[in-house]
Amino acid sequence: IFMLNINVDPKKELGAVKPLHGINNGPISLAGVHNTEKEYAEMGIPFVRLHDTDYPYPQAVDVYQIFRDFSADPNDPKNYDFCLTDQYIAAIIRTGASVIYRLGTSIEHMEKKRFIAPPGDYDKFAAVCCGIVRHYNEGFADGYHYGIRCWEIWNEPESDLMWSGTTEQYFLLYETVSKALKKEFGDTISVGGYASCGFYGIEKKEEERTVFQKKFIAYLSEFIDFVKKTDSPFEFYSFHYYGIGV
């Protein structure tokens, strides 16, 4: 059993506590049936990350839901369908929360996987990602000027439910997309990832780690080495923690 003890000295001032009550996905759910904007605002949710939106049947946010024909021109506004994603993000903005936008796709538990394979054209995929950022931050395709800061490249590529390619293929995707985003948008955005499954067992000695635990630690180490070697933009690291006993 994992236990954490927190000791508080009320006589010592350390400054403001960073907000820790961000949440995954916005107030609109079940294809618009429920809207909890009021509750989000009352709770003061500081940021909302977009992943597995309207799971298990996503219609918005995912790159392949917005840009459905990858033979089309990513520079042409008419090839994007932002309608549902616009509504979804507008509801988040109205609550006062900031958006963390995951560029990629949702998890696929079914036997047939549709969107988790490496893109056929990495440069075109990066161009589409730029189009999405441009829409929400620079008004492209009748868009907005939200100033969304954090753009996360994919989610859990260590998992075969999220990425059917190799480790090297994901690393190349990260390099391609991150460099394209920073080239166009510079310091107006931050790019990172890779929304890791976690790094379980990192507190243990090497010989005490399970094969499962070693996998995630090795992936992180290899990723850090890769972004250093390729000078890929890497401005934040995101990860998940799935609880005790892993």
Annotate each predicted stretch with a short phrase.
Residues 95, 101, 129, 147-155, ...:
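Aromatic- and acid-rich polysaccharide-binding/catalytic face
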Residues 157-160:
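Aromatic- and kink-enriched transmembrane "portal" helix at the membrane-lumen/periplasm boundary
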Residues 1-150, 164, 168-198, 232-233:
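Non-catalytic accessory regions flanking glycosidase/transglycosidase catalytic cores in CAZymes
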